[in-house]
């Protein structure tokens, strides 16, 4: 059972960006909006991100970086932080998953897992 002080939930909404994609050159662009919800009892700061982006051919790109879109937000208990970003993959379908490294106000570092989510061109999946 996880410690209720460090409870971060992540939800994702994705969108295919047809106008930024070029299927003839294997370029498929997607936007995603992520909400990081602090359901724990302590304030937590989002320090960094770690992504695994997998295309439909099974090729994996690993991305690490500080914060999200140039920010390292502090999220109070019961509050959330929402941001939008994007990814480009070389196939019509792919997935993203990963984690955020968090720093709680009591000094503990912990990971908030981001469950796999799908990037898919509309109509690419049956």
Curated annotation (Swiss-Prot):
SUPFAM superfamilies: ApaG-like (SSF110069). Residues 2-126 form the ApaG domain. GO terms for biological process: error-free translesion synthesis. It holds the Pfam family DUF525. This is Protein ApaG. The gene is apaG.
């Amino acid at each position: 059972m996880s410690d209720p002080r460090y409870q971060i939930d992540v939800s994702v909404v994705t969108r295919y960006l047809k106008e930024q994609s070029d299927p003839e050159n294997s370029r498929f662009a997607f936007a995603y909006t992520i909400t990081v919800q602090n359901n724990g009892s302590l304030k937590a700061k989002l320090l960094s991100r770690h992504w695994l982006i997998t295309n439909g051919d099974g090729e994996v790109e690993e991305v690490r970086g500080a914060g999200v879109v140039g920010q390292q937000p502090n999220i109070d208990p019961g509050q959330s932080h929402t941001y939008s970003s994007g990814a480009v993959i070389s196939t019509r379908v792919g997935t993203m998953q990963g984690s955020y490294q968090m720093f709680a106000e009591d000094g503990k570092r912990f990971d908030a897992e981001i469950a796999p989510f799908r990037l898919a061109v509309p109509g690419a999946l049956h």
